[in-house]
Design a protein with these regions (language model features):
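Conserved pre-motif I regulatory segment
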Residues: 1-46
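Conserved nucleic-acid-binding Ia/Ib motif block in the N-terminal RecA-like helicase ATPase lobe
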Residues: 16, 20, 70-139, 147-150, ...
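Walker A/P-loop NTP-binding motif
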Residues: 31-43, 54-69, 89-95, 135
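Conserved catalytic network of the ASCE P-loop NTPase/AAA+ motor domain
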Residues: 36, 66-70, 96-100, 118-122, ...
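Short hydrophobic/aromatic beta-strand immediately N-terminal to the Walker A/P-loop
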Residues: 44-46, 75, 182
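The conserved Walker
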Residues: 47-51
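Post-DEXD/H (motif II) to motif III coupling segment of the RecA-like Helicase ATP-binding lobe
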Residues: 144-212
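Conserved interdomain hinge at the start of the Helicase C-terminal
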Residues: 218-233
Length: 233
């Protein structure tokens, strides 16, 4: 089997965009998940940190976007503002390098809602953010949930805990039954898997990648201290 992004069914523009980031071959979790997501199946994916889970769902989301339709086609839910920001920036990088005018917006409680409402007027196709803020904006009819084709639960084990699962279920219920649900995490408990399965279609697939991550050994990490109000300007 040929282990290339082209063989997984991705358009040339996305493959070129990945090359711009120095990514030339799919990881194990990407090889397993991308075809299933492209086929429309609900998916539970497990793979360790640094294994490429974010691109495992972003790439098929971009591949499936209908650019003739303006409005939210994919919602990516995360348990933390920091993870939401990371996913958003990867989505922005992907659309810039691929030349695909997807339209992405970051919706988190740490940022002013006024600016977010302004960005939603442009009818972005990909929405990334915290469960509470996205649910609030759906209820305010600022997000057209009936257009949503894919919902991603990133770090899904945490989104299935008692503090999040009701809001996650509420977001899902606002969308059409034909929508796709994708859950990813480094590990998924039996309880979390059961909760997720109750929200998914009967033919959902459960995938696991056991190979190591792609974070280079010896990499140096840096951080900058800043005031809370400055983190998501």
């Amino acid at each position: 089997m040929e282990h290339t992004f082209e063989a997984l069914g991705l358009r040339a523009a996305l493959v070129t965009a990945l090359a711009e980031q120095g990514i030339t071959a799919p990881t194990e979790i990407q090889q397993k998940m991308i075809p299933e997501i492209l086929s429309g199946k609900d998916v539970i994916g497990r793979s360790e940190t640094g294994s490429g889970k974010t691109l495992a769902y972003l790439l098929p989301i971009f591949e499936k976007l209908d650019l003739s339709i303006r409005g939210t086609q994919a919602i990516i839910l995360t348990p933390t503002h920091e993870l939401a920001a990371q996913v958003y920036h990867q989505a922005e990088l992907l659309q810039e390098n691929a030349g695909i005018a997807a339209g992405c917006v970051l919706l988190i409680g740490a940022a002013g809602i006024g600016r977010q409402l302004e960005k939603l007027k442009a009818k972005p196709r990909i929405v990334v953010g915290s469960v509470g803020r996205i649910l609030d904006l759906i209820r305010k009819k600022k997000i057209q949930a009936h257009l949503v084709r894919t919902i991603v639960l990133d770090e899904g084990d945490r989104l299935m805990d008692d503090g999040n699962v009701e809001d996650v279920a509420a977001v899902i219920k606002t969308t059409l039954k034909e929508r796709q649900i994708v859950l990813l995490s480094a590990s998924v408990s039996g309880e979390a898997k059961a909760k997720a399965a109750a929200m998914m279609k009967a033919d959902a697939v459960d995938l696991e990648a056991k190979s190591g991550g792609i974070v280079p050994k010896g990499i140096h990490h840096y951080y900058i201290l800043s005031a809370h109000r400055e983190k998501f300007a």
